[in-house]
Regions:
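Residues that mark the start of a beta-strand
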Residues: 2, 24-26, 156
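Extracellular beta-rich ligand/substrate-recognition surface
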Residues: 3-11
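Cofactor-binding loop segments of dinucleotide-utilizing enzymes, especially the Rossmann-like FAD-
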Residues: 8, 30-32, 162, 185
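Glycine-rich beta-strand-centered segment in the early N-terminal region that forms part
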Residues: 18-32, 42-85, 125-127
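Cytochrome P450 core scaffold surrounding the K-helix E-X-X-R motif
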Residues: 37-39
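NAD(P)H dinucleotide-binding glycine-rich loop of Rossmann-like/cofactor-binding domains
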Residues: 82-160
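Mid-domain Rossmann-like dinucleotide-binding core that forms the NAD(H)/NADP(H) cofactor-binding site
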Residues: 128-204
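Short amphipathic alpha-helix with an adjacent loop that forms part of the alpha/beta core around
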Residues: 204-210
Length: 210
């Protein structure tokens, strides 16, 4: 299969990369998104070598479950061992032996195919396009704010940052809170928030050396 993989120093396009050999569900990748985590991996995060990419929508090509074949799916990226206490409790993302799609010990979505356990996959209805479905994984990350904080409608909420994840978190917070201020440094990104009723503060200084 065609795949773009990271060898620890650079990204390489390989037109003859081996297909996934896991005894799992095989998914043909329709679309894959580029995440900030992917860029961090290029700078050494997780010391990962392999195929990057964990935001995807694809079509099931091979499965032990005939009903899954041909279905469009997105996937949870953490695959647990299914034997430890965390996995038994349904907390695979805390499994000490887990693999993480495109991040830890598991090839990702920047390829023609990927594989995941069927339990990690979620079927996408026809009413949702591939272009929308590819955002399911980052949107799920944004919804984790509800696990971390019990939001109250009367709260005044500040979101620091105007990147993609911050934008998604704001949309999640809007479901509960109406008084939201976003602090950011990119005027073009903040303008879109103003149109949706979000207050903005422009001028956060970057801490990056670049």
């Amino acid at each position: 299969m065609k795949a773009t993989f990271f060898d620890g120093k650079k990204m390489i396009l390989d037109k003859n990369y081996p297909n996934p050999d896991y005894d799992e569900t095989l998914v043909r990748v329709n679309l894959a998104g580029i995440c900030g985590t992917d860029l961090e991996i290029l700078d050494g995060y997780m010391q990962y070598n392999g195929i990057l990419g964990h935001e995807f929508v694809g079509t099931v090509e091979k499965s032990d479950n005939p009903e899954m074949i041909g279905k469009r799916v997105v996937g949870e990226i953490n695959a647990g061992c299914e034997k430890c206490d965390s996995c038994i409790k349904g907390m695979q993302r805390h499994c000490s032996n887990r693999t993480v799609l495109g991040i830890l010990k598991r090839n990702g979505a920047f390829a023609e195919f990927l594989s995941l356990p069927e339990s990690n996959l979620h079927v996408i209805p026809d009413s949702i396009s591939d272009e929308q479905a590819v955002f399911v994984e980052p949107l799920a990350a944004a919804f984790e704010i509800n696990e971390q904080v019990s939001l109250k409608p009367e709260w005044n909420v500040a979101v620091v940052g105007d990147g993609r994840l911050a934008q998604l978190i704001i949309q999640v917070i809007k479901l509960t809170c109406s008084n939201i201020t976003c602090f950011g440094k990119h005027e073009n990104k903040l303008e879109g928030l103003v149109q949706s009723g979000i207050k903005i503060k422009l001028g956060i200084e970057s801490t990056d050396e670049q």
